[in-house]
Amino acid sequence: MVDEQSLLAFDTQHIWHPYSSVSSDMPLYAVERADGVMITLKDGRRLIDGMSSWWAALHGYNHPRLNAAAQNQLAKMSHIMFGGFTHDPAVELAQLLVQILPNGLDKIFFADSGSVAVEVAMKMAIQYQHAKGEVQRQKFATIRSGYHGDTWNAMSVCDPTTGMHHLFHHSLPVQYFLPQPNIPFNESWNDCAIEPLADLLKKKGNEIAALILEPVVQGAGGMYFYSPTYLVKAQALCKQYGILLIFDEIATGFGRTGKLFAAEHAGISPDIMCIGKALTGGYLTLSASITTTEIAQTICSGEAKCFMHGPTFMANPLACAIAAESIRLLLESPWQQNIQRIESSLKQQLSPLSEKDYVKEVRALGAIGVVEMKSAVNMKTLVPRFVEQGVWIRPFGKLVYVMPPFVIKDDELQKLTEGMILALTQEYEH
């Protein structure tokens, strides 16, 4: 076992971390293990996890049932190519998904990661329109402050101004961007919010293959919660103009918003849905792009006679076995009560921050709590303050947010929010 200082030194010299400089002086912590909602550092400190490892670890860490699923599958096969083969884990996972997905979504294409699932969905939309003879439909529409991943076409539908990919703006495919829906979740609807989309489709609808949205909750683009009615109105317009509707549920899927899928808040089914992150309970990378039988058959009736995509690790049996067990574990748990409990606690415990002059807004939905600051936080000084308080929270930009594992207990959640408040108080008031 490598000692902490040697590990950190080698890491600093050779390993590149996400969204970081190779010469970064940002704080870096060596993790020894993780159990439940607790992360244990190599120096012995223990942190309550407020991030679910970026939305993924619904059941916490080191869960005995997920460990057993992994061990059982490892004894059979860890991987086999999916071209010309199928296997129990893929079929079992697909059976579970078909039972819980919004109505009509029954053709499942397994992919590697969330970003790749978005790429796959966009390729599906282009191939579908091409197969219908609508070869001029090469563009996509989306709303501002969205985030859909870090691969090429996924970046093209992230906000080009406020997003993380503005450096590539002049190289990426040019898409159509609409204003962020200006009606927050649970506020009364006004049709003015959908008018920009209606205007765009009236003028440019015959150029657009699909509209892609993060339903209800915008994730890394701003952690904004908007009215589900927008989705209902958007779907009607898409149908009117022959445009596919893609829902990116990579962050919101599997209960995070209080519904199994955020689309359920609107009571509708998209034409294509992307899932990932929590699909395997945070154990391995796996995603899926799911569509309808009609769309799949149309794609396969086109020029290529098939869908033109095939990842090496598609439907990896180890990942599929863990994902199937994660879904069973979720459905057998009182997950809805847990989400309601977490949402209620987050609203109550974070509310004092709304009175601070450095805070713009505090909001919570499901197991998501957001403190939006008036200016960007200093990660270099704020993250160590969280660690000193025994909590793991990783803010970005103006957003300090938590999305804890669903299994977090009341006392752990209180320690998480108290640590968050204390760290912010130290950062901004002392």
Swiss-Prot record:
Binding positions for pyridoxal 5'-phosphate per the UniProt entry: 114-115, 248, 311-312
GO biological process terms held by the UniProt record: biotin biosynthetic process
Cofactor: pyridoxal 5'-phosphate
Gene3D superfamilies, A to Z: Aspartate Aminotransferase, domain 1, Type I PLP-dependent aspartate aminotransferase-like (Major domain)
Subcellular localization(s) per the UniProt record: Cytoplasm
One example GO MF annotation: pyridoxal phosphate binding
Catalyzed chemical reaction(s): (8S)-8-amino-7-oxononanoate + S-adenosyl-L-methionine = S-adenosyl-4-methylsulfanyl-2-oxobutanoate + (7R,8S)-7,8-diammoniononanoate
Coiled coil ranges: none
UniProt pathway: Cofactor biosynthesis; biotin biosynthesis; 7,8-diaminononanoate from 8-amino-7-oxononanoate (SAM route): step 1/1
Principal localisation: cytoplasm
Disulfide bonds: none
Amino-acid positions noted as binding substrate in the UniProt annotation, renumbered to this chain: 54, 147, 277, 310, 394
Pfam families hit by this protein: Aminotran_3 (PF00202)
GO cellular component: cytoplasm
Positions where N6-(pyridoxal phosphate)lysine occurs in the chain: 277
E.C. code: 2.6.1.62
Site (Participates in the substrate recognition with KAPA and in a stacking interaction with the adenine ring of SAM): 19
UniProt keyword list: Aminotransferase, Biotin biosynthesis, Cytoplasm, Pyridoxal phosphate, S-adenosyl-L-methionine, Transferase
The protein's enzyme class: transferase
HAMAP family referenced in this protein's UniProt entry, alphabetically: BioA (MF_00834)
Family: Belongs to the class-III pyridoxal-phosphate-dependent aminotransferase family. BioA subfamily.
Its biological purpose: Catalyzes the transfer of the alpha-amino group from S-adenosyl-L-methionine (SAM) to 7-keto-8-aminopelargonic acid (KAPA) to form 7,8-diaminopelargonic acid (DAPA). It is the only aminotransferase known to utilize SAM as an amino donor.
Subunit structure: Homodimer.
PANTHER family per UniProt: ADENOSYLMETHIONINE-8-AMINO-7-OXONONANOATE AMINOTRANSFERASE
Designated name of the protein: Adenosylmethionine-8-amino-7-oxononanoate aminotransferase
